Swiss-Prot record:
Annotated InterPro entries: LrgA/CidA (IPR005538), Uncharacterised_UPF0299 (IPR022957)
Major subcellular site: membrane
Organism: Yersinia enterocolitica serotype O:8 / biotype 1B (strain NCTC 13174 / 8081)
Family: Belongs to the UPF0299 family.
Membrane topology term: Multi-pass membrane protein
Protein name: UPF0299 membrane protein YE2790
One Pfam family this sequence matches: LrgA
C-alpha cells in the first residue's frame, strides 16, 4: 500500500509541475505582447528549469513517461478534426506534398551547412596531428 501511495504522489507532483509550467507560459503570453503560444513558452520554462537543474528531472519523469506512453491517443482528436477538411485536403494534395518535400530538403541543407560551418575548425580528440614533415 505504501508503494502505491508513493507512486501516486510522484505522479501528482509531476503533473502539478508540468501544469504550473504550462500556466506560467500562458500567463507570460497574456502579460507580454508576444505571439508565441503559452503552451510553447510553458515547455521552454520547463526546459529551462530542468536544464539549469533548478528542478530535478526525477520529479517530472513519472508524468512524462505516462504522457509519452499515451501520446498517440492524445493526437486522435487532432486527426479527427483534420478529417473535417478532407475535401480541401484532396484538392490541395499536390501543393501540400511538394511544400512538405521542399521544406524538408531546405531544412536538411541548412542544418547540414550550418553544422559544417560551426564545426569546421574543431579538432577531434585522439586523431593524429599532421605536420609538414608527415606530408
Amino acid at each position: 500500500m505504501r508503494n502505491v501511495t508513493s507512486l501516486g504522489w510522484q505522479y501528482l507532483r509531476a503533473f502539478v509541475i508540468i501544469y504550473l509550467c504550462l500556466w506560467a507560459g500562458k500567463a507570460v503570453t497574456l502579460l507580454l505582447p508576444i505571439s508565441i503560444p503559452g503552451s510553447i513558452l510553458g515547455m521552454l520554462i520547463l526546459f529551462a528549469l530542468l536544464s539549469s537543474q533548478i528542478l530535478p528531472s526525477t520529479w517530472v519523469k513519472p508524468g512524462c513517461h505516462l504522457l509519452i506512453r499515451y501520446m498517440a491517443l492524445l493526437f486522435v482528436p487532432i486527426g479527427v478534426g483534420v478529417m473535417q477538411y478532407y475535401d480541401q485536403l484532396t484538392k490541395q494534395f499536390g501543393p501540400i506534398v511538394v511544400s512538405c518535400f521542399v521544406s524538408t530538403l531546405v531544412v536538411m541543407l541548412v542544418v547540414g551547412y550550418s553544422s559544417h560551418y560551426v564545426h569546421r575548425e574543431r579538432k577531434v580528440m585522439g586523431s593524429p596531428t599532421h605536420t609538414e614533415e608527415d606530408k
